[in-house]
Amino acid sequence: MAQRYDELPHYGGMDGVGVPASMYGDPHAPRPIPPVHHLNHGPPLHATQHYGAHAPHPNVMPASMGSAVNDALKRDKDAIYGHPLFPLLALVFEKCELATCTPREPGVAGGDVCSSDSFNEDIAVFAKQVRAEKPLFSSNPELDNLMIQAIQVLRFHLLELEKVHELCDNFCHRYISCLKGKMPIDLVIDERDGSSKSDHEELSGSSTNLADHNPSSWRDHDDATSTHSAGTPGPSSGGHASQSGDNSSEQGDGLDNSVASPGTGDDDDPDKDKKRQKKRGIFPKVATNIMRAWLFQHLTHPYPSEEQKKQLAQDTGLTILQVNNWFINARRRIVQPMIDQSNRAGFLLDPSVSQGAAYSPEGQPMGSFVLDGQQHMGIRPAGLQSMPGDYVSQGGPMGMSMAQPSYTPPQMTPHPTQLRHGPPMHSYLPSHPHHPAMMMHGGPPTHPGMTMSAQSPTMLNSVDPNVGGQVMDIHAQ
């Protein structure tokens, strides 16, 4: 190794250095030199004797003095280049340059050329070779001390560069691992985006189902309205009220069916499943279906307990946090719109209401709802149009028979209502035996064309005697 450095031409002297003079200047030009006292050859220079090429008058220094300075510099350089430790100094300097400008790749062969461990090996090899050939030190102790200190400084510099590389590698590794593993807040954001998209698609599908259901119900209500108008000129407000009630109830049923059956409709298309999975990008469809099924089974209380969350997390393969966030979004985006829709329709989200009462041909339960605080207009369902009898609602002294078909009673202003059940419809049938307390008299029912007066209260008075008003019978034959 020492022979390798001895053969280098740029270490033989300053004349052999291949450095352009335009970059660093002429190496033989006079330069300002600090006082050098550690060298035992050459006279000491005073601080006032600074000469350089940049001096305004380069010819001030005598020629004999300049030649003496150049000779002293040349002798010092030759002494340094010829020192036994100079090849080791050049080696550590090259390693520092490589550690500074070369990218480190630990997995690549030759990546540890500029490490401090390799330099320790180089020192051992160099010491063996030099001791076999010549001594490590020269006859000048000051020069030996200078070389040793220079090697130590470069060695410290190499160690510091190695520490910097280790810190850089550690930072890069941690940063890349942080990018690869998503943070929990990112999962929450993606889950919200995916659930909002899926809920939007489900609501759009349910609106399509409602559009398919509504035309038939509209036709039925139109037929019922025409039947009313053919017999008697019933008020339009009552017809629209019943029509809106039927439409809203069907809308509620359609919404329940469309949302509660995730396996129908567009979900059967595998291409659309893939597109939707890409849009959501986080939860598999099987996991979503499991949680949605649990939600619709517990609509009355859609709040899973901690044990149920753990069970759902095991069934779906998700974390408890993901399950919890999904149910938070589902209660806001699925359950709440259903409650709002049923409230707008005047239909309470109670299974006993929809299952306990039978439905009439008009779509309303036979246990008909009575509106508190609203004038009852005495409109009979379509199935009871041919039934004899004269029903006067909320009887008062102004009850009268509508014999003229051209008369249209004034439209009553509806009040905020609350639904409650009235008596069964069979209690209004003439052939059904009535209790005297219900009829308020023991005599037979009045003639169909007869006007009900104050001393003969009507059957509907038993429904709510507190509600009174001037109401007229519009179903007189």
From Swiss-Prot:
Q: Which keywords label this protein? A: Activator, Cytoplasm, Developmental protein, Disease variant, DNA-binding, Homeobox, Intellectual disability, Nucleus, Transcription, Transcription regulation
Task: List all Basic and acidic residues biased stretches.
Answer: 193-203
Q: Where is this region: Required for interaction with PBX1?
A: 71-191
Its tissue distribution reads: Expressed in various tissues. Expressed at high level in the lymphoid organs of hematopoietic tissues. Also expressed in some regions of the brain, such as the putamen.
GO biological process terms held by the UniProt record: animal organ morphogenesis; brain development; embryonic pattern specification; eye development; negative regulation of myeloid cell differentiation; negative regulation of transcription by RNA polymerase II; pancreas development; positive regulation of cardiac muscle myoblast proliferation
Record note on what altering residue 151 to A does: Impairs interaction with PBX1
- Enumerate the GO terms in the molecular function aspect: DNA binding; DNA-binding transcription activator activity, RNA polymerase II-specific; DNA-binding transcription factor activity, RNA polymerase II-specific; RNA polymerase II cis-regulatory region sequence-specific DNA binding; sequence-specific DNA binding; sequence-specific double-stranded DNA binding; transcription factor binding
Q: Write down the PANTHER family for this protein, in alphabetical order.
A: HOMEOBOX PROTEIN TRANSCRIPTION FACTORS (PTHR11850)
The disease tied to this protein in UniProt is: Cleft palate, cardiac defects, and impaired intellectual development: An autosomal dominant disease characterized by multiple congenital malformations, mild-to-severe intellectual disability with poor speech, and delayed psychomotor development. Congenital malformations include heart defects, cleft lip/palate, distally-placed thumbs and toes, and cutaneous syndactyly between the second and third toes.
Q: What is this protein called?
A: Homeobox protein Meis2
